[in-house]
Amino acid sequence: MGRKFFVGGNWKCNGTAEEVKKILATLNAADVPSQDVVEVVVSPPYVFLPLVKNELRPDFHVAAQNCWVKKGGAFTGEVSAEMLVNLSIPWVILGHSERRALLGESNEFVGDKVAYALSQGLKVIACVGETLEERESGSTMDVVAAQTKAIADRVKDWTNVVVAYEPVWAIGTGKVASPAQAQEVHAELRKWLAANVSPEVAASTRIIYGGSVNGANCKELGGQPDVDGFLVGGASLKPEFIDIIKAAEVKRNA
């Protein structure tokens, strides 16, 4: 069984109700490959989750951009995994580099979040990736392996995990990892999973790429053997997101 292509759209902290309705209209009218070719998940800000869930076409799914590390309670401003499950939100993005950098989320904290979200029945897009300094010092794989290990130490069943490799230096900067750079890290990450989790998990877990993915570079990136899709930032708010979804065809035609 091949790994189904996965395209996630991370809207980050963007949008008004009117803008969200426009994006939904574009997505709902789009002619894209069927669900057996590509899995599409969009991740609006919390306040728009019910609107998007109710209005989005049924073959696309919805993700939250974060959730709390344990059961709800006296944690002002947080949203628990149980609340997302209660709203039938199937996916959550955890460990995004912006949260690691701006909010100080450690590898261990992200690992705990992933484990708790999975335990409540959510599917998780778990983000890993290195900074420019780390890449230039040659420590990319050490960093990515440590981030992945913190998840592997806490998670036994990887069925509902998608790993998103997002080189921090390529997020929102217009810089993009070359197809060869992306493939190299994805292949090394898969090798790490094979050695430290299991060959089965390595073969079946989707590793997607994030970092300035757009309509112009998505086909070449998506054609790499270990790139199983994308986590798209800014471009997911634009019509070119449709072109990125269509890049799934490169795998079907390979």
UniProtKB/Swiss-Prot annotation:
* Binding positions (substrate): N10, K12
Protein EC:
5.3.1.1
Is-annotated flag, keyword GTP-binding?
no
What the entry lists under Pfam families is as follows: TIM
Compartment(s) of residence = Cytoplasm
Q: Which GO terms describe its molecular function?
A: triose-phosphate isomerase activity
Q: What class of enzyme is it?
A: isomerase
- State a GO cellular component annotated for this protein: cytosol
Name the catalytic site residues. Answer: H96, E166
Q: Which UniProt keywords apply?
A: Cytoplasm, Gluconeogenesis, Glycolysis, Isomerase
Regarding protein family, the annotation reads: Belongs to the triosephosphate isomerase family.
Subunit record text: Homodimer.
What is the official name of this protein in its record? Triosephosphate isomerase, cytosolic
Whose protein is this, by species? Petunia hybrida (Petunia)
Upper taxonomic classification of the species? Answer: Eukaryota, Viridiplantae, Streptophyta, Embryophyta, Tracheophyta
